[in-house]
Swiss-Prot record:
Any one GO biological process: regulation of DNA-templated transcription
One GO MF term: RNA binding
Family the UniProt entry places it in: Belongs to the Hfq family.
Subunit-structure text: Homohexamer.
Pfam family, one: Hfq
Name of the protein: RNA-binding protein Hfq
Free-text function comment from the UniProt entry: RNA chaperone that binds small regulatory RNA (sRNAs) and mRNAs to facilitate mRNA translational regulation in response to envelope stress, environmental stress and changes in metabolite concentrations. Also binds with high specificity to tRNAs.
Length: 79
């Protein structure tokens, strides 16, 4: 039976585990820079300049990691 892969969770978990700096663009154009500390189905906790912020996912437009994220190796580890 083929497993479904959740790209969003895989991507965010990799950013969190590898402590990769990320720029988050919100739908209103505002930018947040920092590190993903935690996430769930609706929110993300980002550590930005020593302060933690809880951001709702529906307010996020784009994530831009500081370095490339390989999702293929993560998918292989899950299988």
């Amino acid at each position: 039976m083929k497993q479904t892969i959740n790209i969003q969770d895989t991507f965010l978990n990799h950013l969190r585990k590898e402590n990769i700096a990320v720029t988050i663009y919100l739908v209103n154009g505002f930018q947040l820079r920092g590190y993903i500390k935690a996430f769930d189905n609706f929110t993300i906790v980002i550590d930005s300049e020593g302060k933690q912020q809880l951001v709702y996912k529906h307010a996020i437009s784009t994530f831009t990691p500081q370095r490339p994220v390989s999702l293929m190796s993560q998918e292989n580890n899950q299988q």
